[in-house]
Amino acid sequence: IEDGTEIVSRSVIFATGISRRKLGVPGEKELFGKGVSYCAVCDCNFYKGRKVLIVGNDSEAAVSAELMTRYASETFWAAWDVEADPKLVAKAKDAGAKLLTSKPKEIRGEGKVQSVLMDDGSVVEVDGVFIELGAKSAADLAMDLDIMPEIDDTIKVNPDCSTKVPGAFACGDITGRPWQVAKAVGQGCIAGMAAVDYVRGKK
């Protein structure tokens, strides 16, 4: 580990989770939890009857935009380089999401989100901003054990949460979607029990 300590183990469980990709604009960090969110599925209920902006170019963002039309009074979707499935884009627009082709430049607000400055100079007044730019995992650590991350930066596991390397298990968000606590808890239990069985079998 970082302090130089070496730990010897017969088994290891990767439960490093993921980190949501940030937009990297002023106001994002300061207003996180005060109108800035990285999960529309998690926080949609908090924005009933309010105005929101979805930020992202892929299918995840399209799905989130369509979802928020069921809750928000007005849903804007900023997608400046659309990569989403055209069918999902159409579904979001048909549901009422207003597609903006400019990129957010600054998230503004005093104590809470109030508006977003776009790179074309326009200002969108909203109560919430959902940044849906995907996520990255801590899979670099797993590469040292030759557990190659999948193309989507996840670790492939079997039903017992084992990986292709004997004795190495993975659970939670690092194994892919859905990124939900319930899944992480369940897989954590499975991985823990499987690791115990593996170690016992090696004695």
Question: Where on the chain are the PLM-derived regions?
Answer:
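Cofactor-binding loop segments of dinucleotide-utilizing enzymes, especially the Rossmann-like FAD-
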Residues: 41, 57, 80-82, 173
